[in-house]
């Protein structure tokens, strides 16, 4: 039985139309599925299964975190992993706001014999921050009003790390020697005006290394703080005879001002723990008044003979910091996580230790936008592991304390980008 050419053509056309319809339907289905997946992946990055410690928001439990466009988009007990373009599994790890190191020295430069002001002893931040979980540093007075513009151009604006600073009351900054003893270069009015001009970066004022038996530098730095509405940080001591520590803490400093190197025992300064191993009563009184006691470990400013009895009597630091520079990084200090680990082993609760390097320093420098992971906050995040084992910790007198816990940085995120990843938590396997 023959089929007419016309009928054959109609059948062929009908078949082609059917195939085309099926093809279009398949394409539409694929597009719909792709669109659904894309819509489902509403977050740039998810961190799941981690134990979040966020002091500002009083969180100390397992939580998932979503990041979008460099900011915290959601913090919930459970977020569907399918909603993230990239997912980091933080099972067994501690997730924290990016650490804030409130005492560093980052005015690295090439001027000789200028100590920490545009010289070799200071360190450029990025090589020493992210690998220890730090996303924000606060330089403790390396620049003064005369060289803050240089510092801004060559350090602040060249760093991925957020760099803030205390402005030295000495116009030439922390240049060492006679330059830091020059009362004529300690101008509170000019310092306050410059701090206001550079308000995006300057968070307070610093006095350090003055060795005269004279309250004038202290009075001038506090005046600068009052004029600008900012705190001051004091590296106190060095005078002969000693200026009384009690007068500094109870009369000279204001609530919110910062006493750094809290656990030091150095010449020219009364230590906070007396000869009988007791914390001096006025030290507790000062902390209750609102004086901020900062660790500022450094290369010569933290000894166990002060820290251990003080911690045993409940005298905890308000902020934990490093005093990072070339003279401290290879000694007992090492990095901020090593310093924090010392306090964990001295029985300071982990939640308090994390707060002392995140939300508390953020408050002290009047930067309430930092140090927490609230929705809408910048996505600066640190993921650490609390290792168990046998460890040794060294002070600046080269004495050792044994411990069984130690913090290690696993991953650091700055403004939503992974900037340090020790074990490839954010990476896929090479053959996948």
Report the location of each language-model feature.
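Divalent metal-dependent hydrolysis catalytic cores, especially in the metallo-beta-lactamase
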Residues: 124-152, 159-177, 198-213, 229-233, ...
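Metal-associated gating/positioning segment near the N- to mid-region
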Residues: 85, 90-157
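His/Asp/Glu-enriched, well-ordered alpha-helical/loop segment
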Residues: 305-388
